[in-house]
């Protein structure tokens, strides 16, 4: 029997990424794990609906044996079985992030016995999670360069607190994974500001993109009033397309925060990214660790080595025979993986 990997959910930044990475890697490698202190670093520790849905989705996709899969649980034992391609549908039952559930199971389905379609219902545009736009426009084009055939479609927008959104991904097994090197982003080719509005006055989006335009005069502007009762909700993004990759920075409207303040938050993140020669933004760096580890080679530059990034690296190295280096440079960090 494979050895059980013991993980401390309180290590590093103590968030849900430790659990999601462990589930992905356990399915792929066949190694069981047990985790204590799940999300110990959060205000509400233990499994929330989003995390529980990820656990149950992983369980269904590989026929795992699992203990501790209940709301609020801070202990989990997961023993995987073989990964099975097919049609899957999961509902979070709240505005929890569809994208984080998808990012838990999709890496395993790169190694399935056939093609798959996974549909998840919940939130598609959430605080502290990659949006559907980020997955489609930023992450998946980079995965394609690594030899991964995966396409996500946004079915319906869903915002906190109502949820009600949905996204689906079609994924094919990968014959092999290629490494990816992102040292320089190259010249900026195009910048696009987009405000999404669901049951929110149109002038809010107009003010948001106007504020972004003051920071980025060259940006194209787009205000989208969503139909179909998917609100209330408001998401503002700035997409920066460069020669080597696309980045996307987002913020969300909340009651009591002005449209201008939301836009200035996006502008601050984007300006900080552009002020550094690093190719990859802080959040994208987190999303690249697992696919690069599975490829066994690759490198990228990032302005800041966050606790989230370092924690994810530590979890990956428990499951895979790879080693990451994180070397300080004059303008940030060079992150490399080798087997």
From Swiss-Prot:
A single GO molecular function term of this UniProt record: ATP binding
Binding site for ATP: 103, 283-287
First-listed, main subcellular location of the protein, grouped into a coarse class: cytoplasm
Listed Pfam families: RTC, RTC_insert
Functional description taken from the UniProt entry: Catalyzes the conversion of 3'-phosphate to a 2',3'-cyclic phosphodiester at the end of RNA. The mechanism of action of the enzyme occurs in 3 steps: (A) adenylation of the enzyme by ATP; (B) transfer of adenylate to an RNA-N3'P to produce RNA-N3'PP5'A; (C) and attack of the adjacent 2'-hydroxyl on the 3'-phosphorus in the diester linkage to produce the cyclic end product. The biological role of this enzyme is unknown but it is likely to function in some aspects of cellular RNA processing.
Record-stated family: Belongs to the RNA 3'-terminal cyclase family. Type 1 subfamily.
Entries under HAMAP family matching the protein: RTC (MF_00200)
Protein name: RNA 3'-terminal phosphate cyclase
Organism the protein comes from: Salmonella typhimurium (strain LT2 / SGSC1412 / ATCC 700720)
Lineage: Bacteria, Pseudomonadati, Pseudomonadota, Gammaproteobacteria, Enterobacterales
């Amino acid at each position: 029997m494979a050895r059980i990997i013991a993980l401390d959910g309180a290590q590093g930044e103590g968030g849900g990424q430790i659990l999601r990475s462990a589930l992905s890697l356990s399915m792929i490698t066949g190694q069981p794990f047990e985790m204590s202190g799940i999300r110990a670093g959060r205000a509400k520790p233990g499994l929330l609906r989003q995390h529980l849905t990820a656990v149950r989705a992983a369980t269904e996709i590989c026929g795992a044996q699992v203990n501790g899969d209940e709301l609020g649980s801070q202990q989990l034992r997961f023993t995987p079985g073989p990964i099975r391609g097919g049609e899957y549908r999961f509902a979070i039952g709240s505005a929890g992030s569809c994208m984080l559930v998808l990012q838990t199971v999709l890496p395993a389905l790169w190694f399935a016995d056939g093609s798959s379609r996974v549909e998840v219902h919940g939130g598609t545009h959430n605080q502290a999670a990659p949006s559907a736009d980020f997955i489609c426009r930023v992450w998946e084009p980079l995965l394609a360069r690594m030899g991964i055939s995966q396409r996500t479609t946004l079915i319906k927008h869903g915002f906190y607190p109502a949820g009600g959104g949905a996204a689906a991904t079609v994924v094919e097994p990968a014959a092999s994974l290629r490494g990816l090197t992102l040292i320089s982003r190259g010249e900026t080719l195009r910048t696009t500001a987009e405000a999404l509005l669901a049951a929110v006055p149109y002038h809010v989006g107009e003010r948001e993109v106007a504020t972004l335009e003051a920071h980025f005069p060259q940006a194209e502007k787009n205000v989208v009033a969503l139909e179909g009762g998917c609100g209330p909700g408001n998401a503002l993004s700035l997409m920066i397309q460069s020669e080597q990759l696309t980045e996307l920075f987002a913020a969300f409207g909340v009651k009591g925060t002005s449209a201008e303040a939301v836009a200035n938050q996006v502008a601050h993140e984007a300006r900080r990214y552009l002020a550094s020669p690093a190719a990859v933004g802080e959040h994208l760096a987190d999303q690249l660790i697992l696919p690069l580890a599975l490829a066994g080679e690759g490198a990228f530059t990032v302005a800041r080595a966050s606790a989230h990034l370092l924690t994810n690296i530590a979890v990956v190295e428990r499951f895979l025979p790879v080693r990451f280096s994180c070397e300080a440079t004059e303008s940030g960090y060079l992150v490399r993986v080798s087997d």
